[in-house]
Amino acid sequence: MQAYEERGVAETDMVRPRPLMRRSIPRDARSLAPSDNRLADFAPPHSSREHGAKLGARSTAVTRKAGHPVKVRNSIALVTGANRGLGRVFCHGFLQNGAAKVYAAARDPGQIHMSGVVPIRLDVTSISDVLEAADVCRDVTILVNNAGVLRDSAMLGEGSEEAARQEMETNFFGPLSIVQRFAPVLAANGGGAIVNILSVASWFTNPSMATYCASKAAAQVLTDAIRMQLRNKGTRVIGVYAGYIDTDMASHVNTRKTAPMQVVERTLAALESGMDRVFADDRATYIDQRVRADPEAFYAELQKHWDATR
């Protein structure tokens, strides 16, 4: 969970990025489904005008101003986990907004069926794959660490250690290894940007998916650390936060989900607007405000949900 200063929600320094409008891309319109007992229980109450007014003053695309703009047009992007889900949509988003080249990385490049991309083999947990990718893709200017895994495991119980190790290897050590090898590549190409796909689970511990929360909290620390370490190299580091995204990874969850293209649009807009933190949906905005405003009350509600379902 992130360490936050003791301050009121109204004191946050947030602004909205200007969206890219080069091409009009339709977004999914989903009806609300019954909530499950994980992150869904902490979605903003859309039926409440009071909450809507409080959150409406700040866009669901909440971000924090930080660095220099990085242009998407004519960029050369590398996206991990690009064979499906959010990674695949990121590849399309880069191409549609004028990227000169997009490396679509996956464990099995044979699963990548997109025109206009350069498929490459990259298992983020394989050092040899990472080294080879860094050697081949020497022209990259934007790196998107998107590959991830979710096991939905409590911290204690059968299989929890295996789940924790798998999630840490993919969600933390994978991006760390990739950044370690690609930071010099980005610096040699003018600095560019690193985009880490995080989660609202980076900010708090939900006991029903605690091992995942631990891996995303570690990825949050990684993001903050490399942002400071690479700033003088001219490399922007952006963290992207969302609740459940409508992909295969969250197919088992019966709740309202965010369209992948919405996440991509807001991320690309943040690149061009000089932002270092992107809230990709309402749930990210809502949970961020609740955790910082009254963490004790937030965790009391989590405990209540946990006790009621056990």
What are these regions (language model features)?
Residues 150-165, 208-211:
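Conserved mid-core segment of classical short-chain dehydrogenase/reductases
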Residues 95-113:
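Conserved glycine-rich Rossmann-like NAD(P)H-binding loop of the short-chain dehydrogenase/reductase
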Residues 115-128:
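Rossmann-fold cofactor-recognition segment
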Residues 179, 215:
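Active-site helix of classical SDR
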Residues 256-257, 261-310:
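C-terminal tail/cap regions
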Residues 83, 91:
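N-terminal Rossmann NAD(P)H-binding glycine-rich loop of SDR-like oxidoreductase domains
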Residues 199:
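Residue(s) in the substrate-gating loop at a strand-loop-helix junction
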